[in-house]
């Protein structure tokens, strides 16, 4: 699967999509393929604040539990509750159905510090 060019990426394998004044966050195809079949997703609540490089939730697969790391600072304005009943969306549709949270960024310039698709692909080749 190709890496969508219109997103930014963190070293912890989260993606960020700018949508006006907000950003949508999820995990990458590479991350879900490394984790295997996702069976549970734990996400924070609307109104919670996230801090860049700090955990904001977790995904549990048949292999392991992995923390989700915030790529930017901000306040959560929306959570994808569909993942409660359908965690398999993370495997099936990591960039569409399986977004995790929507955030109002504290500072939109932080997004520029994240990797482009090309940089992310280069990093994951080395893993």
Curated annotation (Swiss-Prot):
| Co-factor requirement | (R)-lipoate
Q: Which residues carry this modification: N6-lipoyllysine?
A: 63
Q: Which Gene3D superfamilies match?
A: 2.40.50.100
Q: Tell me, which GO biological process terms does this entry list?
A: glycine decarboxylation via glycine cleavage system
- Keyword Cell division among record annotations: no
- UniProt entry tagged with the keyword Membrane: no
In this chain the Lipoyl-binding domain maps to: 22-104
InterPro entries given in the database record = 2-oxoA_DH_lipoyl-BS, Biotin_lipoyl, GCV_H, GCV_H/Fam206, GCV_H_sub, Single_hybrid_motif
Q: How is the cofactor bound?
A: Binds 1 lipoyl cofactor covalently.
Q: Which UniProt keywords apply?
A: Lipoyl
Please give the superkingdom of this protein's source. Answer: Bacteria
- The region annotated as signal peptide is none
Q: Name one GO cellular component term.
A: cytosol
Q: Tell me which family the UniProt entry assigns to this protein.
A: Belongs to the GcvH family.
Task: Give the matching HAMAP family.
Answer: GcvH
According to its UniProt entry, the function of this protein is described as: The glycine cleavage system catalyzes the degradation of glycine. The H protein shuttles the methylamine group of glycine from the P protein to the T protein. Is also involved in protein lipoylation via its role as an octanoyl/lipoyl carrier protein intermediate.
Q: Could you describe the subunit structure of this protein?
A: The glycine cleavage system is composed of four proteins: P, T, L and H.
Query: What's this protein's name?
Result: Glycine cleavage system H protein
The record lists the organism as Bacillus pumilus (strain SAFR-032)
Could you tell me the gene encoding this protein?
gcvH
